Amino acid sequence: MDLCHPEPAELSSGETEELQRIKWHRKQLLEDIQKLKDEIADVFAQIDCFESAEESRMAQKEKELCIGRKKFNMDPAKGIQYFIEHKLLTPDVQDIARFLYKGEGLNKTAIGTYLGERDPINLQVLQAFVDCHEFANLNLVQALRQFLWSFRLPGEAQKIDRMMEAFATRYCLCNPGVFQSTDTCYVLSFSIIMLNTSLHNPNVRDRPPFERFVSMNRGINNGSDLPEDQLRNLFDSIKSEPFSIPEDDGNDLTHTFFNPDREGWLLKLGGRVKTWKRRWFILTDNCLYYFEFTTDKEPRGIIPLENLSVQKVDDPKKPFCLELYNPSCRGQKIKACKTDGDGRVVEGKHESYRISATSAEERDQWIESIRASITRVPFYDLVSTRKKKIASKQ
């Protein structure tokens, strides 16, 4: 006899009914368990589907962010437009400013380019960007370190003026009573930037002493002098540690050449035995770069244009020539560098650079562009103008 399942004849009618009821409940329970399994499987399927969709959405967003950053680093205005169109940014100037302030994946030079434009939106973003900085209880050098690290200062005088004016206003707002006017903060900021260059640029031989720094800043505090101990602290801070200027993202020069002033093939006279070699020239950021091939990431040579002049010149072997030279130091080597055959960076040996174009028109266009690029460092003119403004108030 099966002890687990007794024969119906052995059970009473009541026991038979109880057995049937148990079997029915067991069947219902198994069905309920199966329903729960099906529902759980459905929930997990929905979760998997949601996670897959979320991952896909996040992957798409990350892809769009990457594209937007690349666009911004090549053309800041188009990059911001792309971010807004893809709802990665709102058109609100505060939102744009915070995005630039965080700067994730953004080129600091491109940030400076965008902030320097005169478009009303850009001016509002500049103000909001400066307001992102907290300068309270920082001395001026500390504040400048923070500010000048957040973007790369452009080269045009008007852009620098607007940016430093906004900085001076913000600093004085965060530190009331330190200076008598924003003009004082503005002038002293430029004095510190120029001091940084004079103390740490290897090409500057004359290192200014503290006394000269004091003399530079006499009368800038609405006609009176700033406390000497205040100037001493600022001087010592810069002397012990130069400003950290943002390097181009990616540690290469690639992005520098996205929007050059001029580029093209030219012939350059050089070498121990003077020969003409075809080189790809790029004019940008007050420098003339030349490459062996257009696809090269690193230039064969770099010619800083500061203090140089350019002129047409006749050459017996090549037509349409121009010459780069130093008008105040004829016969001396021009400050420049190049890579030698072993790939080492060495100092250039040219007293002048002779370059040949393919036509008179092309030569004249290069001369015009180079002359436009050869500019004085604008800081001195800006400081001089502001000092005159301070003096006129006395």
Curated annotation (Swiss-Prot):
Domain of life: Eukaryota
This protein's GO CC annotations: centriolar satellite; cytosol; Golgi membrane; intercellular bridge; plasma membrane
One GO BP annotation of this record: regulation of ARF protein signal transduction
Residue intervals of the PH domain: 259-375
Gene Ontology molecular function: any one: guanyl-nucleotide exchange factor activity
Annotated ranges, domain SEC7: 54-241
Membrane topology designation: Peripheral membrane protein
Predominant location: membrane
Positions bound to a 1,2-diacyl-sn-glycero-3-phospho-(1D-myo-inositol-3,4,5-trisphosphate): 268-275, 279, 290, 300
Disulfide bonds: none
Entry function: Promotes guanine-nucleotide exchange on ARF1 and ARF5. Promotes the activation of ARF factors through replacement of GDP with GTP.
Domain notes: Binds via its PH domain to the inositol head group of phosphatidylinositol 3,4,5-trisphosphate. Autoinhibited by its C-terminal basic region.
Protein name: Cytohesin-4
Organism of origin: Homo sapiens (Human)
Lineage start: Eukaryota, Metazoa, Chordata, Craniata, Vertebrata
Gene name linked to the record: CYTH4
